[in-house]
Every structure is written in C-alpha cells, then in structure tokens.
C-alpha cells in the first residue's frame, strides 16, 4: 500500500518546554527524520516543515538542555542537520530543507539517526525516536522493524505517530517502544493543530523504564557481540564529540574485534577504519597469543586513510562518513580544543581555529570567551603511534606556531603574516603555504579576508613592520549612492539589489516599499564591543498627500450627508402618505380641515393626530424615525471612520531601515532568525531593538511627542529665548518675518518719535536670525552710523530697500545653492545607533535615548538588510547615506550636518561679504557727503537723492545684466507663459543633478582623506 500522507520520522533526543513540568523532561537530544520521498507532495512537505518550526519555537533548545537534529530521506539520505542547541539556526536551516525524492525507504532514515546518536549523542542523556508517518509499504516493513530493534537495543526509545485513516495499528504499535507510545492523527493538518501535545508524549516516553521487543515482527539480525575485556583506549566520539579530561564510562562499545577483521596488516600490526568517525582508527596487535586492540585519533585536521594506511589532511581524503557530505550548516564543533571546529569546504571537513580570546559555539561560530585559553592547533595532539607522522606534523605546523600568536578569520582560507601586514599566505596543497603581496596602498585584513585596509605599513625602531591601522576606526560600509551601490569605505563590500528594485539616481536610493538591499558579508561575523550605524533618509510623502486628499473628500461627503439628513429629519409624512414641511406648517396660522369628518381643527390637534394612527392604535412619532435615520447615518460614519483610522494606523506602522535578521511570512508571519539589531522609523518616532550575547534585549524609542529626551543645547537656548520674547510681547508670529515685513514695520513706526534708534537696533538684532546675511550687514551699518543723529528713518527705509535689491541681484549662485540646500534638507532625517561596551544610544536628529545591556551585540547568520526585515513594513522613501562601523568613530561621525565641502563654501561667502562691505563703505561715504550738502542746502537734498538712486539703479542694472546668464540657466520663471511648467521641470532636474554632483564629486575626491579624519 502507498502512503496517503507525509511520513516523517522524528528522532526526538530532547523534550520540549511546552507543557512540560518535570525537570526530567527538560534535557534530551532530538533528531527529526523527515520523509521527503515521492509519496509526499510539495504542499504536504511545507506543512511538515511548518510543524517542525512550531516545535522548534516551543522547545527549550539550548546546548545544556535540548539539542535538535534533523534528517530528510527518500530513496537516499537528503539534507541533514547535526545536533545543536541554537534555535534560530535550526529554524533557518529547516526552512531551506528540500525533498530528496525517490521511493520511500524509512529504514534508511532510522539508520542515519542511529549514526547521528553514535557520533554526536550526549552521554547519559535520554535518546528518543519519534516515527511519524502513514501506512508502510509491505516491502519496507521488515527493514524498518530491524532498524527500530537496533535502535531499541542501543537504548533509543521509539515513539510512533500514525498519520491517516489507512494506517495499520499493529505496524505503528510494533515500531513504538510499547503500545502506550503509539498515537494516531488524521493527517498533516491535524499534526499542525495538535503539535502542542507532542511534548507530553515525549515526557511520557522518557520516563518509561522497560523497553520491549517489537510486537509484530522480530528482527532477524544477530545480536551485537561483546568486545574483548582487554581493549585499550576508548573512542572519544562514539557517544560524544566533547572531549573532557575525566571521561565517563560508555554504556556501549564499538565492536573492535570486527574492525580488526577488516584491518590492513603491516608487520604484525593491523590498522582499521572506525565507522562514522573519519578521524579515528584502530590498531590491532598479537600480544602473547591474544589480540590487543587500541583506538587511536589522528592529529589535528587529519582523517584516517585506509588506502595509505596513515593519517592525511582532510582535503586529501574522501571519507564516506564525513558529515559535511550531508549537513547544511557550514561548520560544527571539534572536540580537541575550545577554539577548534570543523568547517565544510566543497563537501569536505577542514579544521579551523578561532582567534585567541574566542571560543567556538555550535551554530554561532566564534564568540568572545575570556575563559577559553587553550592552544589551537593543540600541541602534541597526535596519538597515532607513528613517529614518522609526528615528524611530519611538526613540519606541517611550521606556520601554525606563528599563527597561534596572531588572530585570523576561521572562515578565511588566507592567513596573515606576522610583521608583514602588506602580505598574506594561502594554502596551496601538499602542506605548502605560498606568500602573496597586497595591492599597493592596501594592507591585509583577517576579518575581511582580503587586502581591504587603506594605508601603508610603518616601521618601528627595530626595523620591523608594524600595523598601526588598528588604531584608526574606519567604516565597514559607506554607501553614498553615487556610483550605484559602490562601497566607498575601501572594503569593497558587495551589496545585493535583487531585481534592481531599489532605484539609484542623483545620489539617492529610492525604496518602493517592496524592495531592499542585502549585505551577505556580515553573516556570522562577530561585531565586537562597538557598533555604530548611521543613516540619512526621507520618507515618501506621496502617500501622505493622497491620504490627506482622501480624508478631505470623506469629510465633504459626510458633511453633505449630514445636511441631507437634516432636511430629511425636518419633513414628516401625513396620514395620506404625502410629505410636508413642518417648518412651513408651524409658520402658518390658518386652519386645517379633517378630510374624514369635514371639521376645522387646530394645528395642535392636527399635530396630535399626526402622532397617533387611529386605525392601528400605534404611535408614529416622526422623532423616532429621525432618530433611526440618524443612527443609520452614524453607523455609516463610524464604519468609514474606522476604515480611515485603520488606514492611518497602517500608515503609522513602523518601517524597517536596517536589520540583521531573516524575516518573512512563510505562513507563520514570524522571523526564522530573529534579528539582534533593528532600526525602524515612523512619522514621529524611531525605534531601536538590540539583543546581546547574554540574551539581554533592549528596546529604545525616540518619540517627538514625549518629553525627557535630550535636545541640542543651541536649539534649546533658542527656544527659550523665543519663549521669553513671546511672554514679554504677547502672542505673535513675527519671529520669521521677512525683510519686506521689517520694512513695513519701520514705515509704520517712523511717525512715532518715541521709538529711539537704539531700540530699533535691538529690534533688528532680535530678528536677524531670519536673514543672517542681510541683517548682519544692516546691523553693522546701523551701529557704524549710530553716532550720526542726522540720519532719518526715511534714509533707513531706502537703505533697506536698496540692500534688498542688492541681495536679489548679487550672488544668484549663492541664493540657488542656499535654496538647493534648504530643499535638500526638507523632510530628511538622520538616525544613528551606537553600541559601545554595553552602552546603547539611539538617536534621531536632535533627540536621543540611552540604555545599558549586558554582553555584546549578538551575531546572526543573515547579514545586514537595508530597508527590510524584522517583521515590519519595508521602507518606502529615499536614502542618502548609510554608514556601518564595528568600532567607535567618536563624536565627529555622529551628526556632521555640514561636510568638509561646506567649509569651502563658507570661505567663498566670507570673501563675498568682504567685497560687499567694501562696496558699501564707498557708497556710505557718498551718502555722508550728500548729507553734509543737505545741511547747507535743503533744495539740493532731493536732487542728490535722486542722483544717488539713479547711480544705484545703473550699477544694479549692470550687475543684473552680468548675472543674467546665470539666472537663465536655473531660473524657474520664463517670459513665455506656455513654457512655465516645462521650465520648472527642467529646473528641478537641474537642481537634483547639481546637488548630486556636488556630493558625489566631493566623495570621489576626498573620501580617503575624509575617512582618515574620522
């Protein structure tokens, strides 16, 4: 019979934390064996993976509690996950598991799980097998029973759950540990619904004491032979890969005698391989007529080669039991040192060491650990009993002795060379390491696994090269979006833009709300004690405008409906079904006839008859009808108001700016790898979420509506000053008045003789923040002329008007640049997250929030994602710059609103101001001469003023003609009315292009100097 539903074999070596109260059920090892044969459809396979993910989230997974593994099988073994205690890595790997296909052979899955228990199972920890599947094909029953009997003999408890209505109860009960450990469910959907019950099943089977043989069919395999009592040595990894000084006794031993039967004999010494342990071998010797067997382990980074009868480098031996052939994760632990681990490269295991001060943790990689001070590679690790191999091992470690004193990236095939940072070495095979030179001007970076550090090595007093670049905090990533997604940090970090969904143009990146950027380089990389991220962005305002228009239309419709309801409520029906206006009826003073009796009645009596139906005896008060109509209208209004509120709530949902977790829906609406870092943004807030290596989680929120956050001191002082002025002079809004408003104010006050010159100067000084250039010059001019009491308010008004025209005509380029900068800053926000030695600071613009956490930022294996992740909405808007540091760049990198190129512009402005001041001095001398003449002859005063005005107009006219070409290039106005829109579009594009070129030219020319300064 064929299997109607999916068949999974869960080898549960752990007990879940859901609903488990007993401490006896909290420690175990779990291997999940998944049926991926042709009997399983893709949809059913996804449901089974979903059930597995739900189990993973409910388990108390940890290296000290529950460890989980998984195997997929069809006709052969497919993807596998070794036993580990990292929940996020398990969920991430389960998601990418694929069906191997082929006929269903469940006994191969059981056999593979037995190997996993033998190689990675913990000693003295319950081992449980859960067989979950449908009806079993008759031809596979015997093999499956044989494997379950072997598992039972190895103290692996088997629990069986049958899926479907066609499963045979006897077969399921025969697989299980006993009949009480056999369960039945309708289908895969029923499994998803009842997945929370499985922890109780597991706890029950863990507490079961007496195993029994299969009830239906007994295995015909021969019982395992007991090993000889004189065996010397124990394999360090048949039940545990964790090597300790005090090794417990093993409950089961390898059949060494059988291994010696297959050994290769060389001069009365036999050498044999050990199943499932590529790095182990057995030595067999005849001693006094008896066979002495000794288990041995190859030196660090070597496997046993049966063909060569010796230990060789792992890359030179194709071991069929190498776990890298079946596992999905890139690395696993190596029990020779706390720093050692195996890395999978091209399907083979390669030994690696974590840098000093770090330890390897399964599923996490190299993590900071001050207690891990073991040597790696371990000295004297060889235990093969062969002197030649020992000699070769010394030669092999010629470079390793030097490398042990240096830190290097365990995931990098390149090694640094001590004292030569401009070089690196690479393993070329046959125990040879070849040196290579970095490109000129660069140094080798172990963390980047490339020559990515800008700089040159310096020599110390002894003549040795010393790498001082470690003292300079440089960004790991800098994206100004000038040359597409080119990284200007010098690290050449690759940034993925899938489908080119993120549009790069004019020095900005546009995110449409469905796109994002991915940076895989930071996957599995320890961030260290300091992390600094800074981003400049602007949300898309088109949605807000559309939303406001919709709200306006909704309010108009609701007002119209309210007016119609008012007219409807003011009209009533009479007994004949005709509608009349009560207001008209109330204004009339005439009499109304009753048609039935022909009598004249008063309006009040008619009103009473209108309220009572004599034929039916019921009240028909129109007020009730009106109330009913009002309730209907109110209900409609409430429904639309709720919809509008929902739209606003959706619009105010946080959008992800950057995260380092892998999150999407996948029918679970959750993250498969929870990010340890996420920055989100909303209309009025910015959110920061951080998780540490000590499982400490910190959430910060910078909200514009909340008090208690820090402000810039300058802005605070300015606000306090404006508030004092407002309290002193009353409620007014003239703080932002333009020059025209000031002229009108002076003209209005010029008749007031009580207004002194000093008061006017103070008034102008108070408002000079509105137009720094014009008002600064004006204040200087007034203070210089203040001693001359002969100047009148009329002259002052003319002077202001003249200055205003000069400002319009002079320096059109400066006005354009200023307008461009104002447009460029409009709506832009800057957000940063700084983590330094456990201190966290989240900041947006001039507000910030702080907190403290234990441990460093937790490393994830998803890399960084810009504009997406963390189970929030994708970012929709523009980004201008993105910085990522793994060090502390200092306060200079926090919020530098004006870049270095702004200094050059300021210098130019100062020169222009000096020229203007000089010109003003000459004009002032002329005016002073004119005023002296006015004292002698009042009649010539008007003529001189007219002449001065004419001269000024000529000068300004010539200046305007000179700047006419500049105005024509970027002017928004045109004499032709039909071409106004087209000119405006061209002008906008020119502004965007000029701003982009200004930024990108600066970045291209000064990025190296600029980064060194930081």
Swiss-Prot record:
Protein localization: Secreted
Record Gene3D superfamilies: von Willebrand factor, type A domain (3.40.50.410)
Secreted is among the record's keywords: yes
Record-annotated VWFA domain positions: 29-202
InterPro entries: Chitin-bd_dom, Chitin-bd_dom_sf, ECM_Assembly_Org, VWF_A, vWFA_dom_sf
Biased composition (Acidic residues): 383-407, 894-915
Region (Disordered): 212-250, 377-428, 539-659, 710-740, 802-875, 890-995
KW Protein biosynthesis (keyword) present: no
GO CC term, one of those recorded: extracellular region
Pfam family, any one: VWA
Biased composition range(s): Polar residues: 859-874
Alphabetically ordered keywords of this record: Chitin-binding, Disulfide bond, Repeat, Secreted, Signal
Entry comment describing in which tissues the protein is expressed: Nacreous layer of shell (at protein level). Expressed primarily in the mantle with highest level in the mantle pallium and lower level in the mantle edge.
Function: Essential component of the organic matrix for normal growth of the nacreous layer. The complex contributes to the initiation of aragonite crystallization as well as subsequent stacking of aragonite tablets in the nacreous layer.
Protein name: Protein PIF
